[in-house]
Amino acid sequence: MSDNRPTYDTSSSDEEPSNHFHIQLPQRQLNLQEIRKQNHKKHEKPTIAKQTASNLAKAKKITTGSNHKFGNSINNNNNNANKHLGSSSAGTNRRSLISPTSSTHVSSDDDDDDDDNAAFYGDKLNDNKKLNVFADTKNNLSHFQFNADGIKPKSLHGQGDDSSDDDGNNLDEVEDETHSDFAVLNQNHPPQQYYETDSSDEDEEDDDEVPQTVHKTYSNASSGRSSRLSRKKSMSETTDTRAPIPPTGRRSTNSNHSRESSGRRSTSSGNINSGGGLKGILRKMSLVDSTPVDSTNQDISHSDTFLGRVLNFGTNQGLSGGGLAPGASRVIREEDEGEWNLDEERRVGFAAHENDRDAFEMQPLNYEDLSEEAKQLIQQHVPGAGASNLDHSQQSSAAPSTEITPSQSPNQHLLNEKSNNNENNQQSTTVESSSSTSSPGEDEELARRRASEERKKAENPFYTPNPDLFLRGTNADNQELHQAPNDFLHDMDGDYIAPPKQVQAGVLSSLLRLYQNPQEQKSASSLSRVSTGTSGTALSSFDDSYDSDDYKDSKSSSNVDLQHKLKSGIKGGSKAMFNKAANKLKHHSHTRTNTVETQGSSNSEEFSNDKDEFSNGYDDDNKMNANLPSFQNARPKMPKKKTTEPVQKLKKLRHKQRAERLRITVHIADILQRQRFIMNMCRALMLFGAPTHRLEEYMVMTSRVLEIDGQFIYFPGCMLVSFGDAATRTSEVHLVRCAQGINLSKLADTHKIYKAVIHDLIGVEDASKKLDDLLKSKSRYPPWLCVLFYGLGSLAVTPFAFEGGWLDLPISFGVGLCVGYLQFYVSSISNLYSSVFEVSAAIVVAFIARGIGSIKGGDLFCFSAIAQGSLAIILPGYIILCGSLELQSRNLVAGAVRMFYAVIYSLFLGFGITLGAALYGWIDHNATSANSCASGHAIDEKWRILFVPMFALCLGLINQARWSQVPIMIVIAGIGYIGSFFAGKHFSTVTEFTACIGAFIVGVLGNLYSRIWKGMAVSAMLPAIFVQVPSGIASKSSLISGLNTADQITNKSSSNNGGTVTNDASSLSFGATMVEVSIGISVGLFAAALIIYPFGKKRTGLFAL
């Protein structure tokens, strides 16, 4: 060993490009205090002090070594390495080439390294020469990380036996690295954990040197240290000019000075399985270590393994992109070419050009591309599966099952799956709320579900094909009545139900099935009377499928005996006695059979199974305990023999027949209940004043939901209902007749029940019960309160419609009470009087009004205002509304009947007024004959609008409306009156145009209320139409036009012919006025429908419930 101190000449690395020693970049100062504490904790043995002293002496000699021998040492070292370059394998384990005694040989390079690695830091070393050495040569060696701040101890992967293989030159590296200049290090250099020492390169180099350096002098070790030092300085000089690199493994770190290292180093990175404790470090995060690692004392969070990077994921030392790309290869440098054929791993992050660094870098996952590829694969292998949706416990999605894009929310999927199920259950029925648009995949899935349900119904004997589809051919009519599915207004109402392909079988066909069962004609005795030979043959053939050939004869004979006994039991005994005897015979038969089987041949399958199951062979015990309760025979050893086959057949046949009868009976009861519900629904809608133009549609939708073959046709006052039976080509016709009335609260309740049924929210039984309770329930307001409302309504309508004065209001209130009493008390008592109620009421009103109006010559009260105001509530406003809606929906029969009835009704009222005025004229010859109020008698126009809300409120309460329904009625009625009032100022002589403008405003508001707030437009529009009718009539005062006729009657005109002509003209004048008003209201409602539903939504039926 030389005493000369070496000078650290960096020219050796430039002159020797084949130098194969590696060194790490230091980045931290030595944290001596921490290292001393750790070392003292781990090594508390007496031998440590001796080893420390010897190693400190060795370190002193190293630092005072000679300088002139470095050149020769380097040359010798290099020559030795080059000689054995080809002979030594890169993958050879270093320990297999080292002598067992080499760890104590001073002149060996490996001995020096091992001894130096077993040493501690001395207390008297200089600051630039402090060493970090661990002292257990047979145990695991510590590993250090260098950076600008300090050095942290790092435990190696390998332990125990691999201690001699890990970093044999650790002492030399530590000594040289402590003399490095840290000022030249780049601040952007990758952190310390990516420059941890990987012993794969040193080990492979040492493997080549082992045959020459095992017995070398220490000068070779010193020359190795100097060469590594020169290489390290050259690396530090090139650090400033190097671009920042991503954090990678040890292989990437050495690539910057790859042109100064040996060509063999390019092969060392490919040999992952070579020896060394640190070969488990992942290179560029994606290389996997294949050598077993003992990580007992390893700090995973600070290691360079995959787990360490995962634990440090949040820092700049964690996982990053890059790594060895799939399909990449490592190519050894061709020295003849003079340039590097860099492998892909090295080219990713350390290429010379910026554009080449990402050639094989792993990119983030593109989920859209993955989704498309998955769809293509699924469609290629499983056609049609790409459009299906998976059913999840909360699923619901508009996306197909192959969609894997993370942006697709499972909740939305779940919300969309639920909407699909609703559409499936309701057969394209939409709920009140807006529904999302379904994708083509959902449509296909929905179509498949419908097809499966239709197939199940087709196989069910209680379903028959819908005659509307194959027999009557009403598809075209359905398309005419209902809008096409692709219309954007299709889902607004939610009442449309597609006609089902299968409907419930009719009652008659079910009865025929019930009473024409051919098996019913056979008695029990005829089924049990079979010959012995036949039964024996049948039973023996049955036994052949279960019994073996060894004991088939004995079993068949016993079965024949059992059959004889059963037959006698069937003939002679009762059913209870027969069952008891059959069970007893069955028990004895099984006992005898088991005894024979136990004593019989042991090669049979039954005996072997019995022996294997119980594995004791207690034959005698089985015989003795045959009559005792035991669980050994609870499990049958073979299928039970049908020893009582005739009886079993008889029982099964009876059970099957009974079950079939029960099914048919339940089916008939269900059909009758559904038909009864449909008729009750029809009766309720007619009684409570549903819009008559939609009654047929309500019934059709209800029958479709209930799967009943029903046909309906409506005439005013009656509904023809036909329930068909396609199997027998018969139909059952019902006629539902009832007096049509108005009850807005019960109409709303009926509408709710109807909605619940068509959306399958409640069953038919519950709906029938609720409907029956609703039909039996009393009215919301008692009759005496309705009479009061009549009086208030008459009081309110007099000022704004007929120009009544303040003094006319109490008179109108009193006369209105009389009209209310006649309607709610007298008319309800006698059906005969209800037929002449309008005429009688008009007579009473005209008589009282003319008598009061004649006071003081007609200057105090206005006869026309009192008479018309008192009769305004019974004017045919609702009849005109229903008639115009029916004409608009092309229901010509009902519409024409109602409109003509409104005209006739008006003629009745006119005739009553004429008769009442004539009666008072006979009494008082000085009775007033004024057809209108005097000027200045009416209330100021600015106060008239205040009575409109009061009139609308009274109309609503008279028609049994809820208080919650009143506000919208008042709003629509008030706005409609304002429009008709100002229209009447300009078109005073044109009654039709005035009524048309008012009805148009009312229709627009009613349709908006129905479309936006999902309310009942008919109930909201009814008071407003009642306001429009009196206003139109009052414009010509045609209601009291019969007053002239009354005067002629009382004055007894001599011109009979002329009087007759005058009488005819006066009688028809009020009817003509009602026709004009009806036409104006109908045209206004048509125009409103055109504005709100510009594409003509026919299926909605204007002003839908």
UniProtKB/Swiss-Prot annotation:
Residues 1-22, 36-55, 65-123, 151-278, 385-473, 520-656 are annotated as: Disordered. Residues 1-11, 85-106, 185-197, 390-413, 520-539, 592-606, 624-633 have a biased composition (Polar residues). Residues 446-459 have a biased composition (Basic and acidic residues). InterPro entries: ThrE-like_N, ThrE/Ser_Exporter. GO terms for molecular function: transmembrane transporter activity. It is found in: Membrane. Keywords: Membrane, Transmembrane, Transmembrane helix. One of its GO terms (cellular component) is membrane. The keyword Transmembrane helix applies. Residues 67-82, 417-439 have a biased composition (Low complexity). The chain crosses the membrane at residues 782-802, 809-829, 835-855, 860-880, 903-923, 938-958, 963-983, 986-1006, 1015-1035, 1075-1095. Pfam families: ThrE. Residues 162-178, 198-210 have a biased composition (Acidic residues). It is a multi-pass membrane protein. Its main location: membrane. Belongs to the ThrE exporter (TC 2.A.79) family. This is Pheromone-regulated membrane protein 10. It comes from Candida albicans (strain WO-1).
